[in-house]
Amino acid sequence: MNKKTIVIINNEKIFTEGKDFYCVNFDMKVLSEGLGAYSDVEFIVRKSKKKGGHKLNLENIKSASNIIKFLYFIFKTFKTKNASYLLVDITPYTFFSFLILFILRKKIFVYLRSNGHEQWRHILGLWSVWIYHVMYKIVTSNSIVMVLSERLSNKKDFYLINPSRLDDLWF
């Protein structure tokens, strides 16, 4: 039986050491490796210069040093037939990826773990929240939304999930 392919697209920064990859965020390790038990996982992330504490046990990781290379990796995934795309959080990187995937009519899931409105307000200030809100509305209106808390989605049809419950049945 052939496994489905899931392309995880995330703003996470990954450190590369030879053929080994390390991340800071343990949740990303658990999510990517958990989905790897059910599917072929391609992981597209940003490159880091700092080694994280969690070694990823995945083979197909593409880490980009800039947005152009990041989007190039997205285009390269189109060789894989019937791939599903999982955007983890909404950031400028995942938003531009979403636009490409949406235009090319790919199956897109978005997984929201935290309130981006609050994060943008904290990082960039109150003036920036409208930028996130525009990205949020566009992405959530045109994808299947999975959230960790009901307060993360204004959409009527979203899936409230436990992170350990993301498996092959979703994709």
Identify the residue ranges that each predicted region occupies.
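Short, well-structured alpha-helical segments in soluble
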Residues: 72-81
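Short internal beta-strands
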Residues: 42-47, 111-112, 148
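N-terminal subdomain of nucleotide-sugar transferases
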Residues: 1-50
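Residues at the starts of beta-strands that form the adenosine-phosphate
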Residues: 4-5, 40-42, 107, 144, ...
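An aromatic- and histidine-rich active-site surface loop
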Residues: 85-106, 110-117, 150-154
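Anion (oxyanion) recognition and catalysis
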Residues: 36, 102, 139
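A short, charged, and often flexible helix/loop element on the N-terminal side
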Residues: 48-72
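Donor nucleotide-sugar binding/catalytic pocket of nucleotide-sugar-dependent glycosyltransferases
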Residues: 125-171
